[in-house]
């Protein structure tokens, strides 16, 4: 630590505290402000758009200072946290009246992006996720907690950085902690990340924190169930939270292991390509997610993050949806749900000591809706709905307690009192009555003094500095009674006090202090009573979230004309009249649905051809989105859907330069393709859109053909869109490959897209017609037509002969070139060898 002896005692104190929190902003309490100094002040001034001033000097230079009012600090802190930064709150803990030198101060709380519970700091529809990554021997152990949910989840051991990146980005955490300084420096996740000291990832410390933080039975179960490296990862979260909270995180009540084999896996690129859960209005989440509560919205996002392949869970969800659809029963349930607040986060705030009086009113009002909700659920007497209903606890005693204790519109905090309802506590009422009756005393006292002095202009008043006083004009100085004691002199008047008024003042001020202290004690006792219902409220919140999501699915099923999917074990995917929800939602004309059939017995690979804008990409995306919806338990946009077991969805759609990594469009495309080829299996759904277009025609064709052949050999269900019409010949070589194309009709030099998938290969690409639709000028179009004519006339024979030779087309005449082609066995040569032969023939 630097020499601080040349600073003032106050700055010395600040620097000592700051040295323990070097990487985060220190909010240092001074009176009614939180002040920041040095670099913290500069950063805060820029982030918060507040004035940067100066205080004193350091080494001859002014010390930068910026501050925010204490009463408005929450809004400023929220801005900082939402930018991914952390804050240490340093409060005055000593008594200014007894302190020698600076008042004692301590950091009472640390606020980080993932460890906030206040409503102002949180997105109500987004889980606040803290991820811990323990790297050891080239393996990654990962655990995460949804802070206000009170649970820790352990993920399977990850063996590659790419696998780790996909897992982390799928969780979309607000904050990451790790033992790896290298990982923190690289930060491939582009999320707030910090490398912690080694002791956070000590196995000994981990077991200690597990024992200290969790219920004894849960702790013993965890210690027996998981291996040391897994325990270290769990313990790192508990130790980090303990340090942040300055207390044991008692709100963590559950730890569970996520079973990957029960999940439909979708990597981050595929999620982006399919527009599953981004913030755009055209994302699948924005169309499907119409939950009535924040609880339901967050649970739906978890469904989107982890689609389940557990058929029992999916059957339960589908059965509940069917029950709620009957007579549109979901409408009544959604009406009740709309009155329920975020009780999960409210009870977490109670446990964490950050709850506000208005939260308790919201909790009471929400709990009052539970009897109505339970009655509505009981009307659907199915085992699945009954199971949910049994986990919703009707907490009438707590409702009564909160109703009696808290006024209807309480102030923002308990700091100045005024929260507890009259009649709840006799002692508090008596203390308040002294203040309430003070007005009558002052009126009578003032009238008595007027009579006694004969001065009609005499006034009795009060201010916070001097207290109660009697005010008289200076012209009446000769009439002042001897018992009047001068308290304050003004320009035109004098203020006095009497022993009687002083006694009254002491009584009033004493009663105020006692009333406030009493009210705070009652409030703390009330919170202790509320926390006794923690587990019941958490379980109730989880059940409300579940019924909210399923009622939402029921409403969406009716509104969007969705149907219940079936599941089979026949390796067959049969879909009829499939629609793309986002496109259907955003166009005025009727959407053209399409059928899809993929089966190991007929075809696993579809080569899809047709013009741009014809519907190829939409067709592929809608199949992937339908599979995804089926595996989150929703109904699907099709008239019929029979789905086999799909464990992963891969997509290669579109590309752009990755400038930050120095990778070209083609390199990005090939990297993503390599990942899919290396990981796809017979249980994968693969979407490939225009592979090979980022390089020369021959290279692109060779690569596209090789990739398509590989997918055919793997047996992955593959939708392969291409402009290389030569690939349609693969259907003659592989029994599990078929061709489909999207039709277009020409009329008077115009093109009309049918958007209908038809068996067979396309005959034409319609590129010039599409260019016309895009607004290319007529002179350019005419030039393009002439160029096309010349190319077809001059190069058709040579190029078509070379390319078609790869697909074993019959020769039309016998010459040396054709004899050479006849001698080639294309079933045994590689694409590279084929290209070499083509170049050799071209030289001839």
Curated annotation (Swiss-Prot):
One of the GO biological process terms: mismatch repair
Positions of disulphide bridges: none
Protein keywords: ATP-binding, DNA damage, DNA repair, DNA-binding, Nucleotide-binding
Gene Ontology molecular function: any one: mismatched DNA binding
One Pfam family in the UniProt entry: MutS_IV
SUPFAM superfamilies the record matches: DNA repair protein MutS, domain I (SSF55271), DNA repair protein MutS, domain II (SSF53150), DNA repair protein MutS, domain III (SSF48334), P-loop containing nucleoside triphosphate hydrolases (SSF52540)
One term under GO cellular component: cytosol
Annotated positions binding ATP: 610-617
InterPro entries: DNA_mismatch_repair_MutS, DNA_mismatch_repair_MutS-lik_N, DNA_mismatch_repair_MutS/MSH, DNA_mismatch_repair_MutS_C, DNA_mismatch_repair_MutS_clamp, DNA_mismatch_repair_MutS_core, DNA_mismatch_repair_MutS_N, DNA_mismatch_repair_MutS_sf
Gene3D superfamilies with a match to the protein in the record: 1.10.1420.10, DNA repair protein MutS, domain I (3.40.1170.10), MutS, connector domain (3.30.420.110), P-loop containing nucleotide triphosphate hydrolases (3.40.50.300)
Family: Belongs to the DNA mismatch repair MutS family.
Stated role: This protein is involved in the repair of mismatches in DNA. It is possible that it carries out the mismatch recognition step. This protein has a weak ATPase activity.
HAMAP family with a match to the protein in the record: MutS (MF_00096)
NCBIfam families according to UniProt: mutS1, PRK05399.1
Protein name: DNA mismatch repair protein MutS
Gene name of the record: mutS
């Amino acid at each position: 630590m630097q020499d601080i002896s040349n600073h003032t005692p106050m700055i010395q104190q600040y620097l000592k505290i700051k040295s323990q929190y070097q990487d985060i902003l220190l909010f240092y309490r001074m009176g009614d402000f939180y002040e920041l100094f040095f670099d913290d002040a500069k950063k805060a001034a820029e982030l918060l758009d507040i004035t940067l001033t100066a205080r004193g000097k350091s080494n001859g230079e002014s010390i930068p200072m910026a501050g925010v009012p204490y009463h408005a600090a929450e809004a400023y802190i929220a801005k900082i946290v939402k930018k991914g930064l952390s804050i240490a709150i340093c409060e005055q803990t000593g008594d200014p009246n007894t302190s020698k030198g600076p008042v004692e101060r301590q950091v009472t709380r640390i606020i980080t992006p993932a460890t906030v519970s206040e409503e102002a700091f949180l997105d109500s529809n987004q889980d606040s996720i803290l991820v811990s990554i323990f790297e050891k021997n080239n393996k990654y152990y990962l655990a995460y907690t949804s802070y206000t949910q009170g649970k820790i989840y352990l993920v399977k051991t990850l063996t590659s950085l790419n696998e780790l990146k996909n897992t982390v980005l799928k969780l979309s955490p607000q904050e990451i902690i790790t033992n790896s300084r290298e990982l923190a420096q690289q930060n491939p996740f582009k999320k707030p990340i910090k490398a912690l000291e080694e002791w956070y990832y000590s196995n000994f410390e981990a077991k200690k924190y597990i024992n200290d933080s969790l219920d004894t039975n849960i702790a013993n179960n965890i210690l027996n169930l998981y291996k040391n490296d897994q325990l270290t990862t769990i313990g790192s979260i508990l130790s980090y939270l303990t340090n942040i909270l300055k207390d044991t995180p008692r709100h963590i009540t559950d730890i569970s292991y996520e079973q990957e084999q029960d999940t439909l896996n979708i990597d981050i690129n595929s999620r982006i390509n399919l527009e599953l859960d981004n913030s755009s209005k055209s994302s699948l989440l924005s169309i499907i997610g119409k939950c009535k509560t924040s609880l339901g919205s967050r649970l739906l996002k978890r469904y989107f993050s982890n689609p389940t392949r557990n058929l029992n869970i999916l059957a339960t969800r589908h059965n509940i949806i069917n029950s709620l659809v009957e007579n549109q029963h979901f409408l009544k349930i959604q009406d009740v749900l709309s009155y329920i607040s975020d009780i999960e986060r409210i009870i977490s705030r109670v446990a964490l000591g950050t709850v506000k009086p208005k939260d308790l009113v919201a909790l009471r009002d929400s709990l009052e809706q539970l009897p109505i909700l339970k009655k509505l659920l009981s009307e659907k007497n199915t085992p699945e709905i009954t199971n949910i209903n049994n986990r919703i606890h009707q907490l009438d005693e707590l409702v009564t307690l909160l109703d009696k204790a808290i006024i209807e519109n309480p102030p923002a905090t308990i700091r100045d009192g005024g929260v507890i309802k009259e009649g709840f506590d006799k002692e508090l009422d008596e203390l308040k009555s002294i203040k309430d009756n003070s007005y009558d005393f002052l009126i009578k006292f003032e009238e008595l003094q007027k009579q006694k002095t004969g001065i009609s202009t005499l006034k009795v008043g009060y201010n916070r500095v001097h207290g109660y006083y009697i005010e008289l004009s200076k012209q009446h100085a000769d009439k002042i009674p001897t018992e009047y004691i001068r308290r304050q002199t003004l320009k035109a008047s004098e203020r006095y006090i009497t022993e009687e008024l002083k006694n009254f003042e002491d009584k009033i001020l004493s009663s105020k202090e006692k009333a406030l202290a009493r009210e705070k004690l009652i409030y703390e006792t009330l919170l202790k009573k509320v926390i006794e219902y923690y587990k019941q409220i958490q379980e109730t919140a989880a059940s409300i979230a579940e019924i909210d999501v399923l009622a939402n699915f029921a409403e969406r099923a009716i509104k969007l004309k969705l149907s219940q999917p079936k599941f089979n074990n026949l390796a067959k995917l049969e879909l009829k009249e499939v629609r793309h929800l986002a496109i259907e939602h955003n166009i005025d004309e009727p959407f053209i649905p399409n059928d899809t059939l993929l089966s190991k017995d007929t075809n696993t690979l579809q080569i899809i051809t047709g013009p741009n804008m014809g519907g190829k990409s939409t067709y592929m995306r809608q199949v992937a989105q339908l599979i995804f919806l089926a595996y989150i338990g929703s109904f699907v946009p099709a008239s019929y859907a029979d789905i086999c077991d799909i464990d992963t969805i891969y997509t290669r759609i579109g590309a752009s330069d990755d400038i930050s990594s120095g990778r070209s469009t083609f390199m990005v495309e090939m990297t993503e393709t390599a990942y899919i080829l290396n990981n796809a299996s017979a249980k994968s759904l693969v979407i490939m859109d225009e592979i090979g277009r980022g390089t020369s025609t021959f290279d692109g064709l060779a690569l596209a053909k090789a990739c398509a052949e590989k997918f055919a050999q793997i047996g992955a269900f593959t939708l392969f869109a291409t402009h290389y019409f030569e690939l349609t010949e693969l259907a003659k070589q592989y029994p599990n490959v078929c061709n489909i194309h999207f039709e277009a009709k020409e009329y008077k030099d115009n093109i009309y897209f049918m958007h209908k998938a038809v068996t067979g290969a396309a005959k034409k690409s319609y590129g010039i017609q599409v260019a016309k639709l895009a607004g290319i000028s007529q002179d350019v179009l005419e030039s393009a037509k002439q160029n096309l004519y010349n190319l077809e006339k001059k190069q058709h024979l040579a190029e078509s002969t070379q390319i078609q030779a790869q697909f074993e087309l019959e020769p039309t005449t016998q010459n040396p070139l054709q004899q050479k082609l006849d001698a080639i066995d294309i079933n045994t040569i590689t694409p590279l060898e084929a290209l070499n032969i083509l170049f050799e023939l071209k030289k001839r």
